[in-house]
């Protein structure tokens, strides 16, 4: 199935969806595909991590989750970019009728604690989530086997020239890529489970940039086209596995403060790396940042 074009705005080589969280969910619910939500530190990884670049390039839809990126874009480029946070996207998914259908949602989670919290949330909120709808991800290691198609280009990165309409023309979907593996991740057990259950929506709740790589891997390994949501910690903000972030804090770009206070040792290094973001926006604007460090082949 070919996804029709939709309005986008380009920042750092990524075409971001223009619209509401509900509209993004409706689009992916109808056509399936890989959706990514780069945080501020993830933009830095575009220069440092070629695996991550390929995973982001493989996305069918990208949302501007980073409040810092949206703010700096407005200050430095004098342009408005609509923000859709991963939290808002996840809540919009939960508000759909699809979320109430047994077996439709499948969660990939970072820990047994996250699984327990997800199941408790489902029971308390009336969602038919069972233990079989949850998968605790292993600690993924980078593969030493490199994909020879290092210039693979997918949906979220810009085409060579910007379209006059401001809408992104999507490439035809092709899951018949037996030799393709997503950058740095393989999990045949997970693929087998998903193939058996065939959920319509796959929520990848692991973080650290691994969610996008796993999402790209699943997109090309599965024989059908579900919606794959690479939204990191966002489900945990709702289920209680992570610190609760009020919607007002998310709306005013200060949700990161709540997270930092809850996990300073883990998050401070990642947030500190985001100090490079304003310089990247000033230097590259709409263009894809150059890769600073090439991965080993």
Q: Which residues does each predicted region cover?
A:
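Proline-aspartate-enriched helix->loop->beta-strand connector
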Residues: 194, 198-208
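An alpha-beta-alpha
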Residues: 97-125, 272-287
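Short, flexible loop segments at boundaries between secondary-structure elements
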Residues: 136-140, 224-262
